[in-house]
Amino acid sequence: MKNKEIVLKAMNDLFHEKDSSAIERYWQKDYIQHNPTMANGHEGLKKLLTLLDVNFKWEPGIIVEENDIVITHSLVNGWGTVPVIVVDIFRIKEGKIVEHWDVVQEETPPSKAVGGNLMTSFNQKKI
């Protein structure tokens, strides 16, 4: 399985299927989490699952794989009160996610954007 396939499967199983066993399958036990609001390792992910809105939805669009790094540009609903645009950066080692960074920004509708553009002008990939 390619690294980007690992990331897509991991995120789908954990966040869409709500399958907590995906944590053991796809994340290294002591993975490093660079988001300052989340803990490292499996326990941080397990806690996150309990905090997510039941309507949480992660829609990846642009996906880039370069060696051991996978980057996704996604639309996320249910993270907060408004949709957010997220760039996730994953480092993969031996088939597991070992490190994660992200940048999160509230979605601005085109009617309020200076250029009038969507923040996700790509075709959303449904998984």
What are the residue ranges of the model-derived segments?
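C-terminal and inter-domain tail/linker signature
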Residues: 1-127
